[in-house]
């Protein structure tokens, strides 16, 4: 039985819809660290930027805190949860106001080392 360590990184209050983030997360779930970075580099979605940062942070945590090699890391779990919504109003005719909800999300990446 092998003893696998896992490391976590979380990015909170990302100003993007969790639905759009999850579309990209589904592409990299279960991939190796280097393969995930390559996929994110060439995807045409803006969600790739914040996800790329979180994956880099998780790899840095693995190297600095646990002494793990970045080349042996795989993405074990990755998910995006809803954050609070920024509430804004849009003025409309005759004194009315329409509500605008700007979504935020929290991205969590859990990586583990393979032997």
Curated annotation (Swiss-Prot):
PROSITE patterns to which the protein is assigned, alphabetical: RIBOSOMAL_L22 (PS00464)
Gene Ontology MF terms: rRNA binding; structural constituent of ribosome
GO biological process: translation
CDD domains per record: Ribosomal_L22
InterPro entries named among the record's database cross-references: Ribosomal_uL22, Ribosomal_uL22_bac/chlpt-type, Ribosomal_uL22_bac/org-type, Ribosomal_uL22_CS, Ribosomal_uL22_sf
Main location: plastid
Residues making up the signal peptide according to the UniProt record: none
Pfam family, one: Ribosomal_L22
One GO CC term, this protein: large ribosomal subunit
Protein's cellular compartments: Plastid, Chloroplast
UniProt keywords, alphabetically: Chloroplast, Plastid, Ribonucleoprotein, Ribosomal protein, RNA-binding, rRNA-binding
Coiled coil: none
Function: This protein binds specifically to 23S rRNA.
Subunit text: Part of the 50S ribosomal subunit.
Similarity section: Belongs to the universal ribosomal protein uL22 family.
Name of the featured protein: Large ribosomal subunit protein uL22c
Organism, scientific name: Phaeodactylum tricornutum (strain CCAP 1055/1)
Name of the encoding gene: rpl22
